[in-house]
Amino acid sequence: MRILMIVGDYNEDLEVRFPQQAMEMLGHEFHSVSPGKPAGSSVVTAVHDLSDTSLQTYTEARGHAFPVTHDFDSIDATTYDALVVPGGRAPEYHRCDDRILDVVRHFFESSKPVACTCHGIQILAAAGVLPGRTVTAVPFCRPEVEMAGANWVDRGLDGIEVDGVLVTASTWMSNAPWMRAFSEILNGAAV
């Protein structure tokens, strides 16, 4: 299968690297694109730490370079079987890019599998594809999810929610069950 992931500077490091490695390990063709960044370039990721419960928010450090494998402007969304929407900081500005929102809408209108984690839900909310769905995400996104017409469920920081062919996860701590559920959907198995 051909899997597309839209990436940008300061996506969460583990939320881009883990899906890429998991999908490639399973034999899928995995492409990453970023508006304004050509194939062969990279985005800079962010490393988020939620473990210090004395803080009211998470900490952030510069992460690794993550490769952009294809030009965003040259992709044809109809040639992809599934979409991965990672979180981190990139969704803050990606949700304002109509080209990204159009790609996201294509996957939902075509009932293709979508895996979304953490702040990536901001892109789905902006694309208008959440009404009537049950999803999870990092708790900071709950107001946006509910204003977008979805039912937000608290699955902790390491949980997931499956709604049809949409798999949402709370944070990078959900990576293993998130990708397991996504791969089961890709394989046509009931989750």
Predicted regions and their residues:
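Active-site-adjacent substrate-recognition loops and nearby beta-strands
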Residues: 138
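Extended, subdomain-level signal for the structured scaffold at the beginning of enzyme domains
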Residues: 1-110, 123-134, 142-191
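ADP-ribose/adenylate-binding Rossmann-like module
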Residues: 111-115
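Short, thiol/selenol-centered motifs that function as redox-active sites or metal-ligating centers
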Residues: 116-120
